[in-house]
Amino acid sequence: MLKKQSAGLVLWGAILFVAWNALLLLFFWTRPAPGRPPSVSALDGDPASLTREVIRLAQDAEVELERQRGLLQQIGDALSSQRGRVPTAAPPAQPRVPVTPAPAVIPILVIACDRSTVRRCLDKLLHYRPSAELFPIIVSQDCGHEETAQAIASYGSAVTHIRQPDLSSIAVPPDHRKFQGYYKIARHYRWALGQVFRQFRFPAAVVVEDDLEVAPDFFEYFRATYPLLKADPSLWCVSAWNDNGKEQMVDASRPELLYRTDFFPGLGWLLLAELWAELEPKWPKAFWDDWMRRPEQRQGRACIRPEISRTMTFGRKGVSHGQFFDQHLKFIKLNQQFVHFTQLDLSYLQREAYDRDFLARVYGAPQLQVEKVRTNDRKELGEVRVQYTGRDSFKAFAKALGVMDDLKSGVPRAGYRGIVTFQFRGRRVHLAPPLTWEGYDPSWN
């Protein structure tokens, strides 16, 4: 590069030198002597005068040539200096320091009413909470129950206590009078979630009821799955609950296992502010959780759920009068082994990868009749698949194997693409529709 620059400078210097001298010669030839105008007649008729004029021009030209030689010398010196200069490399660009985004603040919204046993819920949350700044606890109280209010107030600044202001009765259809509690719950949820997302302006929230106890890695679980929820539009929630999470139906040696499910589990669940903006304008007057399970709300989206639940319920008292608790909820196993989820690669839960691998695993497993699964025949097969072909066969096989047999808008509890996976007598079983399955039938209720 320097050689090209030097050659260019020499060429331009030579051109300028020749052109300048030609112009000077023409100028001196036509210029009159200093102090007197030229006489044309004198020059034409007097040889001596002509000789003197030529001598004068030659002297002037000699002086100018000296000046040009000096100019040419300066050009040469400049070129020599340029050639002798050692090129220096540009200073290396400073490496860009990666900016680690600040961790998201995810509040825990505790929905409370008239259970003073909310202390058990709050004690566990505060015991396992890794950071008060990253996981503020907001207790939203309905019902106006003073003993519960005092229990919440006793935690001081460790929690934020807000109160649902509308404690009035709700007008309900005559055949729904016994369900007024469900109407009040839906009203409370709407108000409390509105406070979290519109008043406090948090980007996400984990909703728990006041009768839930959390696992040691409850916060770690939601911290790790929050980025996945934000990044994958095919997901709309993360739940801490496995509807089929009874102790004999989970693999206790694999607490790190997570799944996608088309069924909305609730009972400790993470949602984003964007989802609340979608749901709030059409929030139902009652039975909000079953409303969430309808296809109009789910829109083909899934939730993440664990193999072993990160919450358990201890509240027999409630609007369901304890029946569901006695039959099912009290048997759900709560995880006790801390899993460092934030150190795990959870990309396998993204829809494309999950569907490919999960379906290959399920339909690659040998098919076995439900009777042989129940009697633990063909143990050498290991993981197996039990195939159902309709609503009635699903319910019959589910009851025979001990899994939840109810359906909401055609979706089985913990199901994904119609498949319910669980442990039975020490081996993995997939209760699955045919491979040609085309979607849920909302009439299966």
UniProtKB/Swiss-Prot annotation:
It comes from the Eukaryota. The keyword Zinc-finger does not apply. Residues 1-6 are cytoplasmic. Keywords: Cytoplasm, Disulfide bond, Glycosyltransferase, Golgi apparatus, Manganese, Membrane, Metal-binding, Signal-anchor, Transferase, Transmembrane, Transmembrane helix. Its main location: Golgi. Its cofactor is Mn(2+). InterPro entries: Glyco_trans_13 (IPR004139), Glycosyltransferase_13 (IPR052261), Nucleotide-diphossugar_trans (IPR029044). Initiates complex N-linked carbohydrate formation. Essential for the conversion of high-mannose to hybrid and complex N-glycans. This is Alpha-1,3-mannosyl-glycoprotein 2-beta-N-acetylglucosaminyltransferase. The lineage of its organism: Eukaryota, Metazoa, Chordata, Craniata, Vertebrata. The gene is MGAT1.
